[in-house]
Amino acid sequence: MPRQSISKESPTMTTPMMQQYKSIKSQAPDAILFFRLGDFYEMFGEDARTAAPILEIALTGRDSGGGERIPMCGVPHHAVDGYLLKLVSAGYKVALCEQVEDPQAAKGIVKREIIRIISPGTLTDSLVEQANNFLAAVYHEQDWGLAFVDVSTGEFTVFQTESLDILTTELSRIRPSELLLPAELLKAKHWRPYYLTQREKKTYQHTLLEERFTEQRELFQEFPTAMKAANGLWQYILETSPGIDPSHILKVNAYRPEHWMLLDPWTRRNLELTESIRGQGKKGTLLSVLDFTKTAFGGRLLRRWIEQPLLLKGEIEKRLDYVEALVEDSFLRGDLIQLFGKVYDLERLMGKVSYGTANARDLLSLAQTLGVLPQLRALLAEGKSEPLQAFIPALEGLDPLAATLEQAINPEAPISLKDGNLLKAGYSVEIDELRSISSGGKAWVAKLESMEKDRTGIRSLKVGYNKVFGYYIEVTHANSHLIPAEYIRKQTLANAERFITPELKEYEQKILGAEEKVTQLEYQLFLELRETVRGQAAKILEAAHALAEIDVYTSLAEAAVRHHYSRPVMKGEGGLTIIEGRHPVVESMLQDTSFVPNDTILTEDKHLALITGPNMAGKSTYMRQVALIVLMAQIGSFVPAQQATIPIADHIFTRVGASDDLASGQSTFMVEMYEVAHILRHVTPQSLIILDEVGRGTATYDGLSIAWAVAEYLAGQENKPKTLFATHYHELTDLEETHSGIFNLHVGVREHGEEIVFLHKIIPGRADRSYGIQVAKLAGLPANLLHRAKIILHELESSAKESRQEHLFNKEKATQLSLFEVQPLDPLLQEVSELSVEDLTPRQALDYLFDLKERIKAADSL
């Protein structure tokens, strides 16, 4: 849940300004109020106590009336974005209260209003460029409804499902910065990872969204629960931005599961698609290998594609056509990469325009980006690629707006809109005339000073200006006898007197009036320009989406060329064939060695591969590479293989490694079993499953039993999902003899005496050894320990051979029951294995050894 700022201000608050503050604070009691006073945003009372240490600013005080002081702190208005981000990141909402009238024109207290409430989900500035910042809402009736929006870009999506499991999977993909929930859903454990905001149920019943998007009414009928979530989301957007029309939100998109692969959080994590499990951010992920995007919105789109592979063959082929066109046209690809380096974030610029926060520099960035479009259209038209020419219409129609902005905005414009100097000379005749008067003032003052020196004979006479007295004539006391009678004394200094004249006062009013008028007129004309841009939001965002796609296709083509990828052959169903496949991430990180490629063939007849071999030999890398190659193909990317034929997978499931989930109170084994259960519940004939060491989180026989049963279950399914199953339980390799769909693979190892070399090559057949001691040696375990391990291993292997049944399987019944006919451990061995040595005194240990020796002798004599 979000932290809350609870108002505990002094009960007096008798000054008019503090009364105004108290009234406005009551409108946002759960937010820290940034109260605009001149050039600062001030915080008072409990808000100040809370904010000061987080913002690392001084906590002071202010008279609140009745002789009492109230805690206070403040931040400069021009640097507010950074301070907002700090508070929001710390879990607080911030209400931004502005002066909404000119202080000079105000009668009494300046009118102030809350113009925005900033929370994690409504933050629009200081965001990660290549990541979305989603605000989400959930609603539940018979189905579950989810709506999410990035208010900084305008992307708005709804999703409806019968399954809470699928809903939480989708939530884990979008990772909302803030989640809106009705009160009855708040306490459920599913929402723990998110910043929660409680909403009244009635806010989900508003019809403002339907009234706004009348042309999309079919969505309200097709996805009624999801659209109620969207209603609640829209109401929150309007409440947190009063008076703002979010015109950059142009439509509501429906997420349809039949169009995109739903990746569960374990698969996204295990495959390290966009985030590294080693906590290094993007480094070491699939995204890091494929991302050659140059634009922020292209980077966000690529991330979305990686997390949402396609299921429709036609859409996949269309993407592959675009990528292939850019692979083949290296000149076009290079020119596009260079051109995209000049493109700013159109989506977020339009978000700022929509929210009324875009300044002159933002419009200049917009103009520069729109100015690139003619060159881009020419490149696409002249290039060899007919598919890419389909983007040209989306890039047309904005040249006049680009020209207007280019002619209007001053490249040296300040950040503040109230400081003037926003517009270029020549854009407005009236502004040019007023500027002429203002700039001509310096020449007029110099001329007046020269004339007065000549007229009075006072050579030290000066004409100057300050903000308190305006223009003045300064004469030293030594020349006081030469002062003309018409001079009017204004100020006495230690060594001089300052005077004004009617002529000087008249010109002062003319100059200062011109400067004030220029500032006001520039501000008004800038607002008109911004409204003109807002009016073109649909066209600008259409161009932005086209640019994002082209940037992503260019990025995928660049990755394909640099890493020597090939175009996959896509099939609706059937067998999976990968010739000389490589792991895209591992390959990219190798410095001095080349990656060893491997083949993969999974058919409907042979669909489950049991993979054995030692640790560090490459089993996990091999399995992950197969999953990544399939995923890459389904986002429309070329793949790291000499050749690949890919049947479209509706799911990619992975069970790779596990650790305790302390927050949920679940052990490693429980987490592992939950993941396996999830896979078995959702698997289909089109699924690809990666299972690594199922059952190792518990006792040996328990783990072996579960791994065995899971393999049999998948092999016996009518749907026959394609499965790669790595295991250290060598007993499982016998399943090849009784289940036609199962076959064995192992990782090649070359032995040189006591040394081993991992070949990283996947070979048909089973591994006969695990080479655990050799791996331990490579890891640097002490030599005496390794020697002892060899002795124990030899004894255990000998014991196992003697106790093992002559036949593990009953061929006629073809059942796995004989697995459990393995003789149990000898009682003495069992007793020793369970002995708590550390709890024995030296004398007790010695006595126990003598006793054990006598019992063994007695047993041998039987």
Curated annotation (Swiss-Prot):
PROSITE patterns: DNA_MISMATCH_REPAIR_2 (PS00486). This is DNA mismatch repair protein MutS. Pfam families: MutS_I, MutS_II, MutS_III, MutS_IV, MutS_V. Belongs to the DNA mismatch repair MutS family. GO terms for molecular function: ATP binding; ATP-dependent DNA damage sensor activity; damaged DNA binding; mismatched DNA binding. PANTHER family: DNA MISMATCH REPAIR PROTEIN MSH1, MITOCHONDRIAL (PTHR11361:SF34), DNA MISMATCH REPAIR PROTEIN MUTS FAMILY MEMBER (PTHR11361). This protein is involved in the repair of mismatches in DNA. It is possible that it carries out the mismatch recognition step. This protein has a weak ATPase activity. NCBIfam families: mutS1, PRK05399.1. InterPro entries: DNA_mismatch_repair_MutS (IPR005748), DNA_mismatch_repair_MutS-lik_N (IPR007695), DNA_mismatch_repair_MutS/MSH (IPR017261), DNA_mismatch_repair_MutS_C (IPR000432), DNA_mismatch_repair_MutS_clamp (IPR007861), DNA_mismatch_repair_MutS_core (IPR007696), DNA_mismatch_repair_MutS_N (IPR016151), DNA_mismatch_repair_MutS_sf (IPR036187). It comes from the Bacteria. The keyword DNA repair applies. One of its GO terms (cellular component) is cytosol. GO terms for biological process: mismatch repair. ATP binds at G613, P614, N615, M616, A617, G618, K619, S620. Keywords: ATP-binding, DNA damage, DNA repair, DNA-binding, Nucleotide-binding. HAMAP family: MutS. The keyword Transmembrane does not apply.
